[in-house]
């Protein structure tokens, strides 16, 4: 592990700032962007890129969760159960996923995100109610953690991308509150994963630390922006982000070949 030059240091902090704003706005850690940037821009292997991105994601998620919960208190019992199920699912699915074709998994996940994004975009562009209705009993909400944790276990990213639309569409949660609950279930998964990667010496702290500093400087602004925007606008932005992410995941193997 070598120390970055001054130019690299400012570049990393700028990247972290952009990812912090992005993560705060959408209630995610930003790893789905950070991993390919670190792999392509800094020549890191996949495992090192994922571990290093986690060192940035964890503080962003913690601060983001705190900021979100101050504006919209999280239903603690559901959030705790969801986080526990997400952590357990992440661990067991990760053990199982090591023998699976990662390319096929990525394609399936990307297709799923694309369908979610298009559906959210279609619903938010039509007749829209500021008071979403639930089509599934709230007692099942903790099991969203299984789907978010499954995504984290299979691909190391995407827990919040899966959980948030499920919370808005199935359980009638407002977008900002759904992102808050999503952060609550993803954060413990990211912490466990960071300790695991660090134990395997797969975290470059000289890169992760300036990324985290930059992210911490802007995540609060992202959270404030998420709460300032109208509900329909936030759902439209989130659906667009899902579509762009899905398309990127589909072309990623060809770009990073």
Give the ranges of each region predicted by the language model.
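Small-residue hotspots at the loop-to-helix junctions and early N-terminal turns
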Residues: 46-50, 179-183
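Juxtamembrane transmembrane-helix boundary motif
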Residues: 1-21, 33-35, 40-41, 46, ...
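Proline-centered helix-kink/hinge sites
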Residues: 35-36, 59, 164-165, 188, ...
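Short hydrophobic/aromatic, small-residue-rich stretches within specific transmembrane helices
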Residues: 53-57, 182, 186, 207-212
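Transmembrane alpha-helices of multi-pass small-molecule transport proteins
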Residues: 52-67
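Hydrophobic alpha-helical transmembrane segments of multi-pass integral membrane proteins
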Residues: 115, 180-193
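Transmembrane helix boundary and interhelical junction motifs in multipass membrane proteins
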Residues: 25-34, 156-166
């Amino acid at each position: 592990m070598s120390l970055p030059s001054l130019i690299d240091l400012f570049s990393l902090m700028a990247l972290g700032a952009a990812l912090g704003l992005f993560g705060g706005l959408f209630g995610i850690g930003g790893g789905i962007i950070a991993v390919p940037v670190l792999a392509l821009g800094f020549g890191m292997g996949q495992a090192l890129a994922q571990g290093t991105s986690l060192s940035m994601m964890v503080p962003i998620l913690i601060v983001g969760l705190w900021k979100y919960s101050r504006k919209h208190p999280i239903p603690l019992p559901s959030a705790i159960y969801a986080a526990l199920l997400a952590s357990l699912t992440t661990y067991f699915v990760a053990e199982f996923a090591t023998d699976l074709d990662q390319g096929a998994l990525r394609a399936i996940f990307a297709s799923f995100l694309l369908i979610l994004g298009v559906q959210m975009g279609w619903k938010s562009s039509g007749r829209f109610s500021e008071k979403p209705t639930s089509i599934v009993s709230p007692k099942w909400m903790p099991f969203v953690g299984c789907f978010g944790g499954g995504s984290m276990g299979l691909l190391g990213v995407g827990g919040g991308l899966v959980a948030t639309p499920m919370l808005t569409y199935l359980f009638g949660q407002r977008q900002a509150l759904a992102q808050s609950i999503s952060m609550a279930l993803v954060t413990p998964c990211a912490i466990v994963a960071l300790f695991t990667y660090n134990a395997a010496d797969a975290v470059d702290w000289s890169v992760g630390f300036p990324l985290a500093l930059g992210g911490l400087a802007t995540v609060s602004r992202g959270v404030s922006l998420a709460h300032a925007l109208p509900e329909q606008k936030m759902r439209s932005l989130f659906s667009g982000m899902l579509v762009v992410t899905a398309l990127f995941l589909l072309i990623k193997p060809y770009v990073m070949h």
